[in-house]
Design a protein with these regions (language model features):
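Non-heme di-metal
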Residues: 2-149
């Protein structure tokens, strides 16, 4: 289902409202539930509970659908992570590159610094590893964006 905001000025009316905030929060919650359930499914598989793993996987698929529904509304006011325009592939690539760039330039280095200051060197190293991965992702999205023209 593709959701569209109805009415004159609906886009301007949604931006920065409590409903806009609620959509972003709901999108984050559904997205996190999806990833948690996939992790739980992996654990259930390892522990020998394939039926439970299937339950988690099926539910994760449902949560993905919910998150996509929220994005159908959110795309009309911008990417919930970057605020940039999303919807068409070219815009999606730019928003994805911007998000990954923020993660490798700012977020993960800051997280690593804090973890190290608090004595969690192993977690700091994990964050530093992720920063490298995010830099690679940003480069791939940027390259793909450039090939679109």
């Amino acid at each position: 289902m593709t959701s569209q905001l109805k009415g004159t000025g609906a886009l301007a009316k949604l931006k920065d409202t409590q409903t806009h905030h609620n959509l972003k929060e709901a999108f984050a919650g559904e997205s996190q539930a999806n990833r948690r359930y996939l992790y739980f499914a992996k654990v259930a598989d390892i522990e020998g509970y394939p039926e439970v793993a299937g339950l988690f996987k099926d539910t994760a698929d449902g949560e993905t659908g919910h998150a996509h529904g929220h994005l159908d509304f959110l795309k009309q006011v911008g990417d919930p992570a970057t605020g940039l325009a999303i919807g068409a592939t070219a815009a999606n690539l730019k928003a994805a590159a911007a998000g990954e760039t923020y993660e490798y330039e700012t977020m993960y280095p800051g997280f690593a610094k804090t973890a190290r200051e608090e004595g969690f060197d192993d977690i700091a190293e994990w964050f530093e590893t992720l920063a490298k991965a995010e830099k690679s992702h940003a480069g791939r999205f940027t390259k793909a964006s450039q090939t679109l023209g």
